[in-house]
Amino acid sequence: MVAQRVRTRFAPSPTGYLHVGGLRTALYNYLFAKKMKGDFIIRIEDTDQSRKVEDAQQNLIKTLEWAGIVADESPVHGGSFGPYVQSERLHIYREYCDRLLEDKHAYYCFSTSEELEENRQLQLKQGLQPKYNRKWLPEEMGGAMPSSNIRKKMAEGSPYVVRMKVPDYISVWFEDMIRGPVEFDSSTIDDQVLMKSDGFPTYHFASVIDDHLMEFTHIIRGEEWLPSMPKHLLLYEFFGWEPPKFAHLPLLLNPDRSKLSKRQGDVAVEDYIRKGYSCDAIVNFVAMLGWNEGEGTEQEVYALQELIDKFSLERVGKAGAVFNVEKLNWLEKQYIKHRPAADIINTIRPVLASELAKRETLLSVDVITGDHYLEQVIELMRERVGFEHEFVTFSSYFFFEPESYEEEAVKKRWIPETNDLLREFTAELEVLEPFTAETIESALKAFVAPKGLKAAVLIHPLRILASGVSFGPSLYHMLEVLGREAVLRRITKGIEQISVAE
């Protein structure tokens, strides 16, 4: 027998941003499909029209593709199992709803929202789990409602929903690929609404039909869908379909182990993109929210292809995964340390162009926007920045004159003789050849030694005047990159602005 080609899906609702939990679900489905040489599909579940947000569908797919998760089939890419938007498949759901009605697995319900709420409150007072009281279950299906009443309501055009009839006193179970066997008692299962009064299906109904018709082999989704499983499995049974394999991913938790929510931090992938996190770090971080390669490995930084090669559902845990931003920050730094300079330049050049449009520079624009200059800045600052944009924003002194000097550092590092020493050393720098880190260091040491001074007496003031701050990369290499003209100009300006009383 030829094994069925693996097909997985990510099925978001177009209600806004892509949640980090949604990204993890999409990623795990993608990794599993690619590991198994199968297909990854995006389906848009827009049956709740009241929550639909304009452009959300395009933004979801765009964000996934930014992360390297490209679908084999989707509303954008097309495919043999379309349409891939549920609102374009309403005729399909109606057809299958009619089949369930005919087979007595579903029935019409005319209860008003007020009646449903009244029944719910009554059950809560009685200490019962709220569920539909089956007021409209017809006599021929074991209920109390005469068929004549139902026909009358239909003839009057009264609004209705269609509910599934959950069998009494049965056990529903399945084998979860992560959690093992899971069992449900049918007495806890409500007669789920399948078709709403607006003619749209509920998530539960449309999802099961589409998962079958689109021939998905594995459904990998969040733990929050686990309580819905018995309803879904019963629908598969009603239609006589073989259900796919299921895997329910662990919850994402805040550091205090509460459920991840916007109240305690950003939850939208777009928020992290705006802050400057790279797709490499975000994907790596999200992949490890529940999955690990296993004992015996210390690897924590993975390329996407490595994740595909090493991913398995057997290594996904059951316990909630803690969303630790510090770990994400650490990963971002690891990628910056090892990312090719050419790739970083592609990211920071637009950032630099934006800054140059807002601020004047005394440096040559052609020089500071060129590959050679940017490569030097990158190699000096790799260990010091947390985001790629900080090569420009955190290291602005490589591109713009310091607008001020760190006040506490000036107080600490300036003595009455500092400016005179700087003027005298400036004369050395004016004729220094070549103007390199090595020659600058040698010249400075040769300058202070006969005076019985330590190099620090000039190192710190030079750094403050050249950059405006008291910290940064190697002073000598920084001065070399800035170049003789900029260094002399900044020293002269600083001497004019900083004075210390005798």
From Swiss-Prot:
Compartment annotation: Cytoplasm
One of the record's GO cellular component terms: cytoplasm
A molecular-function term among this protein's GO annotations: glutamate-tRNA ligase activity
Pfam families: Anticodon_2, tRNA-synt_1c
InterPro entries named among the record's database cross-references: aa-tRNA-synth_I_cd-bd, aa-tRNA-synth_I_codon-bd_sub2, aa-tRNA-synth_I_CS, aa_tRNA-synth_I_cd-bd_sf, Glu-tRNA-ligase_bac/mito, Glu/Gln-tRNA-synth, Glu/Gln-tRNA-synth_Ib_cat-dom, GluQ/Sye
EC number: 6.1.1.17
Chemical reaction(s) catalysed: tRNA(Glu) + L-glutamate + ATP = L-glutamyl-tRNA(Glu) + AMP + diphosphate
Classification via CDD domains: GluRS_core (cd00808)
UniProt entry tagged with the keyword Glycoprotein: no
Residues annotated as binding ATP: K262
GO BP: glutamyl-tRNA aminoacylation
Motif 'HIGH' region per UniProt: ranges: 12-22
Gene3D superfamilies in UniProt: 1.10.10.350, HUPs (3.40.50.620)
Annotated keywords: Aminoacyl-tRNA synthetase, ATP-binding, Cytoplasm, Ligase, Nucleotide-binding, Protein biosynthesis
Keyword Calcium assigned: no
Segments carrying motif 'KMSKS' region: 259-263
PANTHER family: GLUTAMATE--TRNA LIGASE, GLUTAMATE--TRNA LIGASE, MITOCHONDRIAL-RELATED
Function recorded in the entry: Catalyzes the attachment of glutamate to tRNA(Glu) in a two-step reaction: glutamate is first activated by ATP to form Glu-AMP and then transferred to the acceptor end of tRNA(Glu).
Subunit structure: Monomer.
Family: Belongs to the class-I aminoacyl-tRNA synthetase family. Glutamate--tRNA ligase type 1 subfamily.
HAMAP family: Glu_tRNA_synth_type1
Protein name: Glutamate--tRNA ligase
Source organism of the structure: Chlorobium limicola (strain DSM 245 / NBRC 103803 / 6330)
Phylogenetic lineage: Bacteria, Pseudomonadati, Chlorobiota, Chlorobiia, Chlorobiales
